[in-house]
């Protein structure tokens, strides 16, 4: 069974979430993939909280504690992109790809990334925040004095390449921008830089880009071209069309699958 609803206030959204799961009398565990940043340190007093998020009214919200009051079951709590990365590895390995190391980016209203290495999430005291790394500005953005839209860093990857940056540059929402616009090559240059950073840092077998901005075929092709230009043959990778790809599970289903498998791991 599936239910979708908008993310509104914490009180309303978490109530709807609890109401949905409370219907299942044999519920054993749940998996949550949340937007972040979140506290995933089990020893922390604020474990299970959304912390300093850019999303209005959601900072310092106790997600796990609130749901546990209604649903007395184990909860696997991680980021939405970690869930997606886990789901991608699971789906791809089930069809015989034998993936051990994978990076999953979502490029939508924000940017985040999750990394799976040998079946485990990458992260020390917390999870990666790879959407907020700094990137080299595109010459057109420099010429136009475009600072970026991230409320914390302005010109980080998210500030320059997430969906809202398209509208900030053009005054038009991304889905209404013609594919001939220069703005797509600007976006591709930043997304390719993210892929370069992931390649050189983790040496993954696969980089997956999900989210609304990447849901257009022309964007993937632009990123492929720019990635090969920037990497310039420095390290070997699989053929770019096999290396930098879109999700294996349709309709953002990677996160749902990942959350299911992670929840199941709590009761096995």
Task: Describe the predicted segments one by one.
Residues 1-30, 38-46, 65-73, 90-101, ...:
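ATP-binding/phosphotransfer module of carbohydrate and carboxylate kinases, centering on a glycine-rich
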Residues 44-59:
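A charged helix-plus-loop insertion that forms the helical arch/lid used to bind
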Residues 77-81, 85:
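Short loop/edge segments at beta-strand edges and connector loops
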Residues 80, 108, 259:
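Active-site glycine-centered loops adjacent to acidic/histidine catalytic or metal-binding residues
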Residues 103-105:
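Conserved beta-strand elements of the Class I
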Residues 111-116:
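Short beta-strand scaffold segments in enzyme catalytic cores
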